[in-house]
Design a protein with these regions (language model features):
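Flexible, solvent-exposed loop/hinge segments and secondary-structure transition points
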Residues: 2-155
Length: 155
């Protein structure tokens, strides 16, 4: 049986089960849009897209992006997919005296508690997450929110 035929059959079964699927094709289209916006802003970013299991589907490194941003972008996508919330929202819940204080020390330190990670949905169902790193906190947060909006409009 043809591999593409199998992939289409699996995607159809998942859709019928009421689940959303993050495909490599969707991830690449999203990354392209976020990269263009980052270029407009003068940001050299690393952009990561994860599936609902918080596993990377695609990672893109813009030229001259910070080396450390690679793991940070992956971990932002991991955090948003794994906790089903943006990393900006998590930052509110993870401060001193808040219910999730200290969560960044779990999961082998992969939980990120600052902006740049967003949950991605298709028709109200979670398909995965986006992580962006390389700019300021505000730039990463903006680019991730932009990516979420673009994705949900049908990348």
């Amino acid at each position: 049986m043809d591999e593409q035929l199998i992939c289409r059959a699996v995607e159809q079964a998942v859709r019928e089960a009421g689940m959303a699927v993050m495909t490599l094709e969707k991830a690449k289209r999203l990354i392209d849009k976020v990269e263009k916006k980052a270029e407009e802003m003068g940001v050299r970013a690393i952009i990561a897209v994860a599936n609902t299991a918080a596993r990377p589907v695609a990672v893109h490194c813009m030229d001259n992006a910070y080396i450390a941003s690679f793991d940070i972008a992956l971990n932002k996508a991991y955090t948003s997919a794994g906790l089903k919330m943006s990393t900006a929202k998590l930052s509110e819940l993870a401060g001193p005296g808040q219910p999730l204080y200290g969560i960044q020390h779990t999961n082998e330190g992969k939980i990120v508690i600052f902006g740049g990670g967003e949950v991605l949905e298709i028709n109200g169902k979670i398909a995965g997450a986006l992580g962006v790193s390389g700019g300021t906190l505000e730039q990463d947060t903006f680019l991730a929110a932009y990516g979420k909006e673009v994705f949900e409009q049908g990348v």
